[in-house]
Amino acid sequence: MSQKVLPTKINLIQFRRQLRLITVIKRLLENKREVLLLYLRTYASQYEKIYNEVNEEMKKVYESYLQAVASEGISNIEEMALSQKPSLEVNSAIKVIFGVKVPTIRLDKSTIPAKPFSDVETSPYLSESYEEMTEALNKIIELVELESTIRSLVSELRKTQRLINSIDNYILPFYRGSIKFIKQILEDRQREEFSRLKIIRRILQRRRESGSR
């Protein structure tokens, strides 16, 4: 590719300037990559913590639910569940983390359905299961938000790494090769010009010497 570059001093100056600029851009991208990795480690740690908490809470919900099934019967519980229309809603928005758009998700607590049963007439395990599930909802939503955030950060990290790879593998070699090519041609021309000048000086010197005899 270097051979397609016009070997002039102006191009040499421009290519050197562009090489310095590209080096600065690469350094900025590397800094961005480090910051993204730092955010990813932080959010991954939070995700693991919340995931474990949700896992424990859902175990409690399931245990209470199984005990409620044993007391009330699966058909009665299914009938109560089917009597409820889907009503849960979440409020979502976008926030920016180091130039990366990530979602924020919040549960609209007013849309949580009321108990479709009476605490007096049904098993206390059913009420316990409902309360535990209601408490777990916020953490489940938080888990979803963290997962979406991590995916967005990973996507941006991959884009950044691809740009760095492109600079390392294609752009920098092109500019360095072009600069080397131009320098070599200019140096060769300079040597040729120097040789011509020496020859001309010798010729002139001989003429002067011949004229003085």
Swiss-Prot record:
GO terms for cellular component: plasma membrane; proton-transporting V-type ATPase complex. Gene3D superfamilies: 1.10.287.3240. InterPro entries: V_ATPase_D. One of its GO terms (biological process) is proton motive force-driven plasma membrane ATP synthesis. The keyword Transport applies. GO terms for molecular function: ATP binding; proton-transporting ATP synthase activity, rotational mechanism; proton-transporting ATPase activity, rotational mechanism. Keywords: ATP synthesis, Cell membrane, Hydrogen ion transport, Ion transport, Membrane, Transport. It is a peripheral membrane protein. Pfam families: ATP-synt_D. The keyword RNA-binding does not apply. NCBIfam families: PRK00373.1-3 (NF001544), V_ATPase_subD (TIGR00309). Belongs to the V-ATPase D subunit family. Has multiple subunits with at least A(3), B(3), C, D, E, F, H, I and proteolipid K(x). Component of the A-type ATP synthase that produces ATP from ADP in the presence of a proton gradient across the membrane. This is A-type ATP synthase subunit D. It comes from Saccharolobus solfataricus (strain ATCC 35092 / DSM 1617 / JCM 11322 / P2).
